[in-house]
């Protein structure tokens, strides 16, 4: 019978072999609108460089909008989030993700340095994503703000999410998939979980979401308490009180 020590040594030896077989990833570092951006070197090869450069232009434009739309205090917090550009992963759809959990990252081949950062493994479809979700970078940054600044268990947000689910007011709403594509009616992505409720409504607050409520005005009519909470946590000035009519 093999001893536990022998098994441990065997496991460590296997890990060393696996590590040697998988070359370490290397990245180039750039700064866009005050954010640190780490670009996987494989995206900068001649075959990929043009697509990557176009994605970087679009990313810079989205970050510039974030700076324009969001108050300086929250922007300073958002700029602490490192952005990572990666090639697509085998057996995964190209996507952008905020990495909050080490366990998920280890299981899906991400490097530890990406923890609490945002990874864009969707460079090839970046332009299409900006058409579908005009503020999709803000969506991911909202996840980071929720985790790093507000805390995942923010009590006010949790209560409003539970109330929205119970009300069923998001069960069948309009969805826009981009220019020249028909509007559909679906359950709102915001109801997936509280994190998506915050990110989706933050898109509506600052610009246009791809699900109803699309805009700040629609959010104020559909979910006024959530609008009020968002204005508070994003440090927006209080809206002016209505002026009394003059005689």
Annotate each PLM feature.
Residues 1-8:
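Bacterial N-terminal signal peptides that target proteins for export
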Residues 31-53:
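Acidic/histidine-rich, surface-exposed loop or edge segments in extracytoplasmic proteins
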Residues 18-24:
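Boundary at the C-terminal end of the N-terminal hydrophobic targeting segment
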Residues 112-114, 161-246:
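Metalloprotease/metallohydrolase-associated module, dominated by Zn2+-dependent proteases
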Residues 46-61, 127-132, 136, 189-193, ...:
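Soluble non-cytosolic domains of exported or imported proteins
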Residues 56-162, 166:
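Acidic/His-rich structured neighborhood in mature extracellular/periplasmic domains
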Residues 8-17:
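Bacterial N-terminal signal peptides
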Residues 38, 82, 144, 197-201:
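Structural recognition of the beta-strand scaffold that forms the well-ordered cores
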